Structure formats: C-alpha cells, structure tokens
C-alpha cells in the first residue's frame, strides 16, 4: 500500500517548491518533529498591507483515478467529498466552502459512449454540490486527452477553498502517545454512494469537535483508507499505533471518502460522540 504512487512519499517533489514565500504559511507541507506527516490541505494567512491578520485561506483537493475509470459518476462525486473533507480536517467548514474543478477527458470523436464519460462525471459532481450546498465557481476543462490509441482516465479534480482562523487550524500528525483515536464515517448505499444526510452529520460533528478544541489531529480518509491515515499520521512524530479492534483487510484499505481518523484531546467523553454510524474507538 505505502509503495503505491498515489500514497508513497512525494517529499522530494514537494520540496522543490517554496512554501514560505510571504511568511504567511500556517501549515508547512510536512508536519511533526521529523517533518514526515504530509499535510492534506494548504493553510496560509491572507496577505495584508498593514498590521496582522489571523484570517486563513484553506484549500484541499480530491481525485481517485481508479474509481473514476470504473465510474466517472462515482469518481467525480467522491472528488468533491474528498476535497471538502480535507478542508474540514484542518479546521474549515463545508458551509463556507467553494469549489473549482479541473476536468480532462479523452476526445469524444462523436462516440456516444465517450461523450457519456464527461456527462456522467458532471452529474456526479452536480449531485454532490446540490446536496452539500457548495458551488463550483470556476475551473478549467480539456477534451483533448487522446494520443493515438491512448486515452487519459476520466478526470474531474475538485479543489475546495474556504477560510478560517489561524488559531483553529489543526495539523495532522499524532501529537502524543496514549491518546484516544476514533474513526468516524458516513453511511453508504448499495451502490457505494455516500448518504449525504449521514455525511453532513459527520462533517458537522468533526467541525464541532475541532471548534471546541477537542481534536489534536485529524485525517480525512482517502484513497489508501484507514491504513494510509494511521501510517502517515504516525510518521511525523514517530508515534506508534495499536488497534483495539480487529479490522478486516477491506476495512483497513477501503477508500471511504467522507470518513475521518481523529486523535482526541485528553478527557473527551466518547459517549458524547455519536452519529448515525457508531464511532469505532482506536488507541495509540
């Protein structure tokens, strides 16, 4: 799992870009004492000419090329959910989120099946926008992703943008040994599509926990599932992890978009954290 190109370390590439220009960076690209936990979303204070500000811009992205190749509808919907979840994981809110899409598809060549791919993707993204009340206000598209017999996978990358206060931003590396860690996830239907009422309940619960200062670190589960989340959260401070429950391989590696792995602050009552699907207590 860790060796997958979508999951493995991209530190060498990331460090080619200067993340400190303007001295407004809130979250560096890698967190923790050892700077090995990748940050899922960008957070930087807005530049001002005079004085100081704590107003912080946040931006996260979402895209699963494998899911999109199987079903552009599922892929686009999940991209929107993933991008917004990453914003929430570091302290944002979905109610103050705006989207921009980057779309890239094969040449349609007047083929109804090929035309169906961008149509399906746009319907999936539209469904997510309507359900969450987050509109896409910009983007860039191309329908030239074909070279001879090679086509790009159906591509709709979602970027979610929001604002928060710098003091509310949460980084993603585990902070200390002995913390309680929970998994909160929404419900999904028989077609593996997220239940949006359940998803909004999850989003609101995570936002409330962060706003109340009850979260030490938070990770929006994405392509690599819970296993990716736990591994990368552990790297930054070299804190190990032990599961209290036995998880199946499917539960460990399944990409459940809209789910969160959360390290709780000391003294948080787990019985008060309840949504439609029971939380799963895990421990460091």
Q: At which residue positions do the language-model features occur?
A:
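Glycine/proline-enriched, intrinsically flexible loops and inter-domain linkers
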Residues: 1-272, 276, 280
């Amino acid at each position: 799992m860790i060796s997958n190109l979508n999951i493995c370390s991209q530190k060498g590439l990331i460090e080619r870009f200067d993340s400190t220009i303007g001295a407004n960076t809130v979250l560096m690209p890698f967190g923790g004492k050892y700077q090995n936990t990748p940050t899922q979303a960008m957070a930087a204070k807005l530049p001002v000419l005079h004085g100081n500000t704590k107003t912080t811009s946040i931006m996260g992205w979402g895209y699963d090329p494998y899911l999109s190749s199987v079903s552009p509808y599922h892929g686009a919907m999940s991209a929107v959910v993933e991008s917004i979840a990453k914003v929430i994981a570091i302290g944002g809110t979905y109610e103050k989120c705006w989207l921009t899409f980057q779309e890239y598809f094969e040449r349609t060549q007047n083929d109804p099946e090929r035309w169906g791919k961008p149509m399906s993707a746009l319907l999936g993204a539209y469904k997510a926008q309507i359900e969450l009340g987050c509109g896409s206000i910009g983007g860039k598209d191309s329908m030239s992703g074909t070279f001879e017999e090679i086509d790009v996978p159906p591509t709709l990358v979602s970027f979610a943008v929001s604002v928060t206060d710098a003091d509310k931003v949460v980084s993603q590396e585990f902070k200390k040994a002995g913390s309680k860690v929970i998994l909160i996830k929404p419900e999904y239907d028989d077609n593996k599509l997220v239940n949006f009422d359940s998803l909004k309940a999850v989003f609101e619960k995570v936002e409330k926990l962060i706003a109340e200062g009850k979260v030490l670190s938070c990770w929006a589960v994405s392509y690599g599932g819970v296993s990716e989340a736990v591994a990368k959260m552990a790297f930054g401070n070299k804190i190990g992890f032990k599961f209290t429950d036995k998880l199946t391989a499917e539960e460990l590696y399944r990409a459940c978009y809209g789910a969160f792995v959360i390290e709780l602050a000391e003294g948080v009552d787990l019985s008060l954290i309840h949504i439609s699907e029971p939380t799963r207590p895990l421990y460091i």
